[in-house]
Amino acid sequence: MTSTATYPTISNWLDNHRDELIQKSCYIFEHPETAYKEKLSSKCLADYLETQGFQIEWNTAGIETAFTAAWTNSDIDITKIQPAGKNVSSSNEVPIIGFLAEYDALPEIGHACGHNLPVSY
């Protein structure tokens, strides 16, 4: 996949899954969890992404509820991708796209901060 093909691939995936992502955002809104206690929220998202072919790795940065979800539409082993975007076993460049979402709620208020919204893009 070239970098010029990256945006349409991501955009199409988001468009095709828009309703499901909005449902996940609503679920998180309806089940507010404060920082570092987002067990239902993170499980909801990770389970969904896993059904979509993402590989889930828990305990990102030593945070129990944090996870990294990795996906590729090529034959590249994503476990061998280095931060510079080079595959260890070849010289092929691959795009690496990062997305960070916070979905912790405020104590006693819930999601007045809107942290559930990044889930729906």
Language-model region placement:
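Acidic/His- and Gly-rich active-site-bordering loop/insert found
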Residues: T2-S120
